[in-house]
Amino acid sequence: MAKVAKKRTTRTRRRERKNIERGQAHIQSTFNNSIITLTDMQGNALSQASAGQLGFKGSRKSTPYAAQMAAETAAKAAMEHGLKTVEVYVKGPGAGREAAIRSLQAAGLEVNLIKDVTPIPHNGCRPPKRRRV
């Protein structure tokens, strides 16, 4: 006689609401995409959004508007955890740097500090060759 296997029920763990007032906003803006991560002061992520995640595809991912929408989405999610003030760390040469910072301020977060943390090589890797269009 065959035994009937028990159904396994998986419980989805609800994200607990953290009460964090101060945090950091890490904006990584490349030539292809913009990634915004909001963290607490130790660097533990509260929320994250990117232009590609929001449905922007191809060359539209690298626009300032896409970075603005990504920053807005990440800010709203982080503000649910009680985030009020942020220190902004910007990395990369992309078009969405300033747009993302302005969007964080417009969403209601107070920006205390803006710091450029773009890594600069001391003559490391050879850069890509010039594009010929």
Swiss-Prot record:
One Pfam family recorded for the sequence: Ribosomal_S11
GO molecular function, one term: rRNA binding
Single Gene Ontology BP annotation: translation
InterPro entries from the UniProt entry: Ribosomal_uS11, Ribosomal_uS11_bac-type, Ribosomal_uS11_CS, Ribosomal_uS11_sf
Alphabetized UniProt keyword annotations: Ribonucleoprotein, Ribosomal protein, RNA-binding, rRNA-binding
Subunit relationships: Part of the 30S ribosomal subunit. Interacts with proteins S7 and S18. Binds to IF-3.
Protein's recorded name: Small ribosomal subunit protein uS11
Gene of this entry: rpsK
